[in-house]
A protein has these predicted regions:
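Conserved core segment of the aminotransferase class I/II
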Residues: 98-155
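Short, charged/polar "capping" segments at the starts of alpha-helices
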Residues: 15-22, 84-86
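Catalytic phosphate/metal-binding cores of nucleic-acid and nucleotide-processing enzymes, i.e., regions
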Residues: 1, 11, 37-43, 130-131, ...
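Active-site phosphate-binding strand-loop segment of PLP-dependent enzymes
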Residues: 28-82
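Conserved beta-loop-alpha segment that forms the PLP phosphate-binding cup at the N-terminus of a helix
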Residues: 1-9, 115
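Short, charged, surface-exposed secondary-structure boundary motifs
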Residues: 19-23, 39-41, 108-113
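A short alpha/beta connector and helix-capping loop motif
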Residues: 86-101
């Protein structure tokens, strides 16, 4: 969020509540997509699958093409992807800056903060700095690795 703190954050109603809580707490500007059109100067967060219905969002490719055209950065939040089956999504849209994953929706490990963020570029933010100094929560990583080795994504 900090990289785009000067932008207006956007998300659909039904998006994962963590984002709205974070934006409110940090006093970031934000608005539901349903309440205004996407504009240059926005930053978009989308969950895949969509947390509001567990499935696809309508017109997602059209929205991402508009984001590319308007240079709107997009974070794809895949925290619910382990719960999805037969999911298909095109991550090739140039507007997509980050893709994040979490194990806390499939396993009871929320306090271990097991997840990862993928990025097209090294923009030297906090996570890249931590990684460059090899600061990693190895215990959480090991627990997460053991869980995904032992249990299929649809075990629960």
């Amino acid at each position: 969020y900090l990289k785009h703190k000067g932008k207006r954050f956007r998300a659909f109603q039904g998006e994962y509540a963590y984002h709205f809580i974070s934006w409110r707490y940090a006093k970031f500007r934000w608005k539901y997509i349903e309440d205004d059109v996407l504009r240059k100067g926005d930053a978009l967060v989308l969950s895949v699958p969509f947390s509001g219905n567990g499935g696809d969002l309508k017109n997602i490719d059209k929205i991402l093409k508009k984001c590319t055209r308007l240079k709107i950065p997009v974070l794809i939040d895949c925290c619910y992807s382990p719960l999805a089956t037969n999911m298909s999504f095109n991550f090739d849209h140039p507007c997509i800056e980050y893709v994040s994953f979490s194990l806390s929706k499939i396993f009871p490990v929320g306090h271990l903060r097991i997840g990862m963020r993928l990025s097209r570029t090294d923009d030297d933010d906090q996570l890249f700095v931590y990684k460059s100094f090899n600061y990693k929560n190895r215990l959480s990583m090991k627990i997460g690795l053991d869980l995904i080795k032992k249990f299929d994504h649809d075990y629960i």
